[in-house]
Amino acid sequence: MSKRIWQLFASAITVALLSAVYPAFAASEPEQLVTKAEETFKNFQNDPQMSWLRSHLNAAKAVMIAPEVRKAGFVVGGSGGRAVLLARDKETGNWSGPAFYTIANASLGFQAGIEKSEVVMLIMTEKGLNSLLNDQLKLGADASIAAGPVGTGAEKGITTDVVSFSRSKGIYGGVNLDGTLVTINDGWNARFYAKAVTPVDILVRHSVTNYNAQKLQDQIAQAVIK
Protein backbone atom coordinates (compact mmCIF):
# COMPACT_ATOMS: atom_id res chain seq x y z
CA MET A 1 0.00 0.00 0.00
CA SER A 2 1.45 3.40 -0.98
CA LYS A 3 2.37 6.06 1.54
CA ARG A 4 -0.45 8.29 0.27
CA ILE A 5 -3.05 5.58 0.78
CA TRP A 6 -1.72 4.93 4.28
CA GLN A 7 -2.07 8.63 5.08
CA LEU A 8 -5.66 8.69 3.84
CA PHE A 9 -6.45 5.53 5.79
CA ALA A 10 -4.94 6.97 8.97
CA SER A 11 -6.86 10.21 8.51
CA ALA A 12 -10.13 8.32 8.08
CA ILE A 13 -9.51 6.33 11.26
CA THR A 14 -8.69 9.50 13.19
CA VAL A 15 -11.88 11.20 12.02
CA ALA A 16 -13.94 8.13 12.94
CA LEU A 17 -12.45 7.98 16.43
CA LEU A 18 -12.95 11.68 17.05
CA SER A 19 -16.54 11.46 15.82
CA ALA A 20 -17.22 8.66 18.28
CA VAL A 21 -15.83 10.67 21.18
CA TYR A 22 -17.17 14.08 20.09
CA PRO A 23 -20.37 13.53 18.07
CA ALA A 24 -21.00 16.21 15.47
CA PHE A 25 -23.51 18.81 16.54
CA ALA A 26 -23.98 17.12 19.94
CA ALA A 27 -26.16 19.38 22.07
CA SER A 28 -24.71 20.67 25.31
CA GLU A 29 -26.55 20.13 28.60
CA PRO A 30 -27.95 23.69 28.60
CA GLU A 31 -29.15 23.25 25.02
CA GLN A 32 -30.79 19.95 25.96
CA LEU A 33 -32.57 21.67 28.86
CA VAL A 34 -33.90 24.34 26.50
CA THR A 35 -35.24 21.62 24.18
CA LYS A 36 -36.92 19.88 27.12
CA ALA A 37 -38.38 23.22 28.22
CA GLU A 38 -39.94 23.61 24.78
CA GLU A 39 -41.68 20.26 25.22
CA THR A 40 -42.78 21.05 28.77
CA PHE A 41 -44.25 24.41 27.78
CA LYS A 42 -46.05 22.76 24.88
CA ASN A 43 -47.50 20.14 27.26
CA PHE A 44 -48.91 22.81 29.56
CA GLN A 45 -50.11 25.02 26.74
CA ASN A 46 -52.06 22.17 25.13
CA ASP A 47 -53.50 20.84 28.40
CA PRO A 48 -57.24 21.66 28.65
CA GLN A 49 -56.88 21.84 32.45
CA MET A 50 -54.44 24.76 32.18
CA SER A 51 -56.93 27.45 31.16
CA TRP A 52 -55.81 29.83 33.94
CA LEU A 53 -52.20 29.61 32.81
CA ARG A 54 -53.16 30.36 29.21
CA SER A 55 -55.44 33.25 30.08
CA HIS A 56 -52.94 34.92 32.43
CA LEU A 57 -49.77 34.38 30.44
CA ASN A 58 -50.21 37.78 28.80
CA ALA A 59 -49.97 39.43 32.24
CA ALA A 60 -46.79 37.60 33.28
CA LYS A 61 -43.49 39.47 33.54
CA ALA A 62 -41.53 36.26 33.05
CA VAL A 63 -41.90 32.49 32.75
CA MET A 64 -39.77 29.87 34.50
CA ILE A 65 -39.82 26.31 33.16
CA ALA A 66 -38.38 23.28 34.95
CA PRO A 67 -38.81 20.20 32.75
CA GLU A 68 -37.90 17.80 35.52
CA VAL A 69 -37.99 18.40 39.28
CA ARG A 70 -37.01 15.22 41.09
CA LYS A 71 -38.01 14.09 44.54
CA ALA A 72 -34.55 13.03 45.67
CA GLY A 73 -31.03 12.46 44.48
CA PHE A 74 -30.42 15.80 42.76
CA VAL A 75 -28.74 17.21 45.85
CA VAL A 76 -27.61 15.26 48.89
CA GLY A 77 -30.57 14.70 51.15
CA GLY A 78 -32.88 16.86 49.08
CA SER A 79 -34.80 17.41 45.89
CA GLY A 80 -34.61 19.70 42.91
CA GLY A 81 -33.93 20.28 39.26
CA ARG A 82 -32.80 22.84 36.72
CA ALA A 83 -34.88 25.58 35.15
CA VAL A 84 -34.84 28.28 32.50
CA LEU A 85 -36.24 31.79 32.89
CA LEU A 86 -37.48 33.96 30.03
CA ALA A 87 -38.63 37.54 30.54
CA ARG A 88 -40.70 39.99 28.54
CA ASP A 89 -39.33 43.42 27.69
CA LYS A 90 -41.60 46.09 29.16
CA GLU A 91 -41.27 48.37 26.15
CA THR A 92 -41.18 46.04 23.14
CA GLY A 93 -43.04 43.03 24.52
CA ASN A 94 -40.34 40.75 23.11
CA TRP A 95 -39.23 37.70 25.08
CA SER A 96 -35.56 37.23 25.95
CA GLY A 97 -33.48 34.53 27.58
CA PRO A 98 -33.25 31.98 28.83
CA ALA A 99 -31.24 32.43 31.98
CA PHE A 100 -30.42 29.16 33.76
CA TYR A 101 -31.23 28.34 37.39
CA THR A 102 -31.01 25.52 39.90
CA ILE A 103 -34.02 24.61 42.05
CA ALA A 104 -33.29 22.87 45.35
CA ASN A 105 -35.05 22.09 48.61
CA ALA A 106 -34.27 19.64 51.38
CA SER A 107 -37.96 18.78 51.67
CA LEU A 108 -39.90 19.53 48.52
CA GLY A 109 -43.51 18.60 49.14
CA PHE A 110 -44.28 15.84 46.65
CA GLN A 111 -47.58 14.00 46.72
CA ALA A 112 -47.37 10.31 47.57
CA GLY A 113 -46.18 8.18 44.68
CA ILE A 114 -44.68 11.06 42.70
CA GLU A 115 -40.96 10.94 41.98
CA LYS A 116 -40.67 13.81 39.50
CA SER A 117 -42.75 16.62 38.04
CA GLU A 118 -42.55 19.16 35.26
CA VAL A 119 -43.12 22.71 36.46
CA VAL A 120 -44.06 26.04 34.89
CA MET A 121 -44.07 29.22 36.98
CA LEU A 122 -45.59 32.52 35.90
CA ILE A 123 -43.75 35.49 37.41
CA MET A 124 -46.59 37.98 37.81
CA THR A 125 -44.91 40.98 39.46
CA GLU A 126 -41.82 43.15 39.09
CA LYS A 127 -40.87 42.14 42.63
CA GLY A 128 -40.89 38.49 41.64
CA LEU A 129 -38.76 39.12 38.56
CA ASN A 130 -36.30 41.38 40.39
CA SER A 131 -35.92 38.74 43.11
CA LEU A 132 -34.90 36.21 40.46
CA LEU A 133 -32.21 38.57 39.20
CA ASN A 134 -30.48 38.24 42.57
CA ASP A 135 -28.07 35.40 43.31
CA GLN A 136 -30.65 33.38 45.25
CA LEU A 137 -34.38 33.51 45.86
CA LYS A 138 -36.41 31.63 48.47
CA LEU A 139 -39.94 31.09 47.23
CA GLY A 140 -42.48 32.01 49.88
CA ALA A 141 -40.04 34.35 51.64
CA ASP A 142 -38.37 36.63 49.08
CA ALA A 143 -41.34 36.30 46.72
CA SER A 144 -44.82 35.02 47.49
CA ILE A 145 -45.98 31.91 45.65
CA ALA A 146 -49.26 30.06 45.15
CA ALA A 147 -50.21 26.92 43.29
CA GLY A 148 -52.02 27.80 40.10
CA PRO A 149 -55.68 26.89 39.65
CA VAL A 150 -56.43 23.84 37.53
CA GLY A 151 -59.56 23.23 35.49
CA THR A 152 -61.95 25.24 33.36
CA GLY A 153 -63.65 26.84 36.37
CA ALA A 154 -60.39 27.91 37.99
CA GLU A 155 -60.48 30.81 40.46
CA LYS A 156 -59.15 34.18 39.40
CA GLY A 157 -58.25 36.01 42.62
CA ILE A 158 -54.55 35.14 42.87
CA THR A 159 -52.27 38.06 43.73
CA THR A 160 -48.93 36.39 44.56
CA ASP A 161 -45.62 37.24 42.92
CA VAL A 162 -45.29 33.74 41.48
CA VAL A 163 -47.95 31.26 40.37
CA SER A 164 -46.74 27.69 39.92
CA PHE A 165 -48.17 24.78 37.95
CA SER A 166 -46.91 21.21 38.11
CA ARG A 167 -47.83 17.94 36.41
CA SER A 168 -46.74 14.39 36.96
CA LYS A 169 -48.26 11.24 35.48
CA GLY A 170 -51.59 12.98 35.00
CA ILE A 171 -51.61 14.39 38.55
CA TYR A 172 -51.80 18.16 38.88
CA GLY A 173 -50.20 20.17 41.67
CA GLY A 174 -47.92 17.25 42.48
CA VAL A 175 -45.21 19.34 44.14
CA ASN A 176 -45.27 22.19 46.67
CA LEU A 177 -42.53 24.72 45.89
CA ASP A 178 -42.97 26.89 48.98
CA GLY A 179 -39.58 27.28 50.67
CA THR A 180 -37.66 26.22 47.57
CA LEU A 181 -34.33 27.92 46.81
CA VAL A 182 -33.90 29.17 43.26
CA THR A 183 -30.23 29.90 42.52
CA ILE A 184 -28.58 31.34 39.41
CA ASN A 185 -26.61 28.67 37.54
CA ASP A 186 -23.61 30.73 36.44
CA GLY A 187 -21.86 27.74 34.88
CA TRP A 188 -24.72 26.86 32.54
CA ASN A 189 -25.27 30.51 31.63
CA ALA A 190 -21.60 30.76 30.65
CA ARG A 191 -21.76 27.54 28.64
CA PHE A 192 -24.89 28.54 26.75
CA TYR A 193 -23.70 32.05 25.88
CA ALA A 194 -19.97 31.22 25.58
CA LYS A 195 -18.98 33.84 28.17
CA ALA A 196 -19.62 34.79 31.78
CA VAL A 197 -23.01 36.50 31.96
CA THR A 198 -25.65 37.30 34.56
CA PRO A 199 -29.44 37.13 34.29
CA VAL A 200 -29.38 40.94 34.13
CA ASP A 201 -27.15 40.73 31.04
CA ILE A 202 -29.49 38.16 29.49
CA LEU A 203 -32.94 39.41 30.47
CA VAL A 204 -32.55 43.16 31.04
CA ARG A 205 -29.61 44.42 28.99
CA HIS A 206 -30.16 41.83 26.22
CA SER A 207 -26.40 41.85 25.65
CA VAL A 208 -26.19 38.18 24.63
CA THR A 209 -28.24 35.86 22.43
CA ASN A 210 -28.16 32.24 21.32
CA TYR A 211 -30.07 31.01 18.28
CA ASN A 212 -30.91 27.79 20.16
CA ALA A 213 -33.31 29.85 22.29
CA GLN A 214 -35.36 31.21 19.40
CA LYS A 215 -37.91 28.39 19.26
CA LEU A 216 -38.73 28.63 22.96
CA GLN A 217 -38.99 32.42 22.76
CA ASP A 218 -41.35 32.10 19.79
CA GLN A 219 -43.46 29.47 21.57
CA ILE A 220 -44.11 31.77 24.50
CA ALA A 221 -44.68 34.83 22.32
CA GLN A 222 -47.23 32.98 20.19
CA ALA A 223 -49.00 31.63 23.27
CA VAL A 224 -49.36 35.16 24.64
CA ILE A 225 -51.14 36.50 21.56
CA LYS A 226 -53.58 33.59 21.17
What are these regions (language model features)?
Residues 1, 26-27:
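Absolute protein N-terminus
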Residues 1-11:
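Bacterial N-terminal signal peptides that target proteins for export
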Residues 10-20:
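Bacterial N-terminal signal peptides
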Residues 20-26:
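Sec/Tat signal peptide C-region and signal peptidase I cleavage site
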Residues 27-226:
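Small-residue-enriched, tightly packed secondary-structure blocks
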